[in-house]
Swiss-Prot record:
NCBIfam families: rluA_subfam (TIGR00005)
GO MF: pseudouridine synthase activity; RNA binding
UniProt-listed GO biological process terms: enzyme-directed rRNA pseudouridine synthesis; mRNA processing; mRNA pseudouridine synthesis
Native organism: Homo sapiens
Protein name: Pseudouridylate synthase RPUSD2
Length: 545
């Protein structure tokens, strides 16, 4: 090192030390011109070296300026320079005697990062073993079982308490139930028991709610295998059985029945049939086969053919309906013809007429939700026993010609009220706990709560209300009993002291409630074609209208 003419003490490595101002300055050549950096050796009020300054060559317009800190500032709060160019000032450094807050230092609740979710098929032996079936009165029934509902905190829940979320979005149970569930250890937040329902939720919070689950019965009719090879499994789906878990259904679904009774696992549904629709249903055995056939669907290489029985005398000539279809509510699963809807096309041909109803062959050329049912309603010939689109809730004309003298909110209110009175909310893929505001969402599923005029839909069936009224007086005692039950292997019990459903007596559905006269008859694609037998109600001599 040596002194130069300007009083700089030169140091190897392009560093210079200013004897007049205790600081180091380093210069070097950059891509955009000369670069310089100054580091002060003075100890600031924080007890450390002053921050360095850096200039970026000619691009910044100040390459020739060498910055060095001025004289020490008096102790006290430093005045920050005004932001340049509208930029927000950066956070100030801690003052004298202050330390930067460390995470969790103020007992603030720390949320662990979300776990990586499993991809692909999610049902295996551990899921199939949760419970078992039994058969009674022509029905397949599921023994009640314990089940963990798991979810990450939704955006609309952030900043709200658990108490608020349960009281506004999970109304299947009274708040007294959730308080008892906390005492019984049924509610967990980030894998730790919830101690207080007033805890405020944060982003990435992981919720686990252990419930005693009851599933609705379905037909005892077996699922018949139509074909099986190394690529696909094709079955004849009975009416009333959902394809995959949804709503209150889990084990009483085609996916679970095939896994439990036929050891057919890791199946990929290639298309969907409504719960009350019967007929040809295809599954791929691998993701590669699934992608190949879905590509054929997108390229319109597949042909689907259905048969149905409709009201009245359908025209003898072929009828093509191209009316667009709009989803009124994703939650309820209701659609209607509307100019704002997506383009659809269905071709109809009458097969027979028995004087009261007609058997009609249907060829959907597009694949919209409830397409056949909605188009038949528009044509004035709804499916004979369609519980949604042949309902008086649509008005006197039952939606013929697209005439519906109600708003979407009024339509949904009347549909839900009708099926609630019949205790048949499963037809709408609903249970009592789903009856909260926000049933109308015609553009997409909404994350916001719905309108106040749907508040009346939050009421459960009368029997459920009676149980809820009695619950607060009983749940304190029940919670203690539940804690002891857990200790004695409650997971094997079919009754649960906290479960309101266990104290209800529900009537079994009638056989006619488990069938809709819509059947998937044929499914054809490149290199394959599968048929299902014509159902009894589609025969020419059928006379049970």
């Amino acid at each position: 090192m040596w002194l130069d003419r300007r009083g700089w003490l030169r140091v190897l490595g392009h560093w210079r030390y200013d004897l007049r101002r205790p600081s180091f300055t380093r210069t070097w050549s950059g891509d955009k011109g000369p670069m310089a950096e100054t580091v002060s050796t003075q100890v600031g009020t924080e007890g450390g070296l002053r921050a360095s300054h850096q200039q970026n060559g000619d691009a910044g317009g100040d390459a020739k300026v060498e910055l060095s800190p001025g004289p020490p500032k008096p102790a006290g709060r430093e005045v920050e320079p005004a932001p340049v160019g509208g930029e927000h000032p950066s956070a100030a450094a801690p003052g004298p005697g202050k330390h930067k807050k460390r995470r969790g230092a103020t007992r603030e609740r720390v949320v662990p990062p979300p776990k990586k979710r499993r991809t692909g098929v999610s049902f295996g032996d551990e899921h199939f073993a949760e419970t078992s079936y039994y058969f009674e009165g022509g029905l397949r029934k599921v023994r009640p079982y314990y089940f963990d509902f798991r979810t990450y905190c939704k955006g609309r829940w952030v900043g709200h308490s658990l108490l608020h979320v349960f009281s506004t979005e999970f109304r299947a149970q009274p708040l007294a139930y959730y308080e008892a569930a906390v005492r019984a250890g049924r509610l967990q937040l980030n894998e730790k028991p919830v101690q207080d329902l007033n805890i405020v939720l944060k982003d990435n919070d992981f919720l686990r709610n252990t419930v005693h689950r009851h599933e609705p019965p379905v037909t005892a009719e077996p699922i018949r295998l139509l074909a099986e090879n190394e690529d696909v499994v094709v079955v004849d789906k009975p009416s009333s059985i959902p394809v995959h878990p949804c709503g209150r259904f889990r084990h009483n679904t085609v996916i679970f029945i095939l896994g439990k009774e036929h050891q057919l696992k890791e199946l990929h549904p290639l298309h969907r049939l409504d719960r009350l629709t019967s007929g040809v249903l295809m599954f791929a055995k691998t993701a590669a086969v699934s992608e190949r056939i879905h590509e054929q669907v997108r390229d319109r290489q597949l042909e689907k053919e259905y048969v149905c029985r409709v009201e009245g005398e359908f025209p003898t000539e072929e009828v093509t309906c191209k009316e667009p279809i709009l989803v009124v509510s994703y939650k309820v699963g209701v659609c209607r013809v509307d100019p704002r809807g997506k383009p659809c096309e269905t071709v109809f041909q009458r097969l027979s007429y028995n004087g009261q109803s007609s058997v009609v062959r249907c060829r959907p050329l597009t694949g919209r939700t409830h397409q056949i049912r909605v188009h038949l309603q528009f044509l004035g010939h709804p499916i004979l026993n369609d519980p949604i689109y042949n309902s008086v809730a649509w008005g006197p004309s039952r939606g013929r010609g697209g005439y519906i003298p109600k708003t979407n909110e009024e339509l949904l209110r009347d549909l839900v009220a009708e099926h609630q009175a019949k205790q048949s909310l499963d037809v709408l893929d609903l249970c009592e706990g789903d009856l909260s505001p926000g049933l109308t969402d015609s553009t997409a599923p909404s994350s916001e709560l719905g309108k106040d005029d749907l508040e009346e839909l939050a009421a459960a069936a009368q029997k459920m209300e009676e149980v809820a009224e009695a619950a607060p007086q009983e749940l304190d005692t029940i919670a203690l009993a539940s804690e002891k039950a857990v200790e004695t292997d409650v997971m094997n019990q079919e009754t649960d002291p906290l479960c309101a459903e266990c104290r209800l007596v529900r009537q079994d559905p009638l056989p006619q409630d488990l069938v809709m006269f819509l059947h998937a008859l044929r499914y054809k694609g490149p290199g394959f074609e599968y048929f299902s037998p014509m159902p009894a109600w589609a025969q020419d001599d059928w006379q049970k209208d």
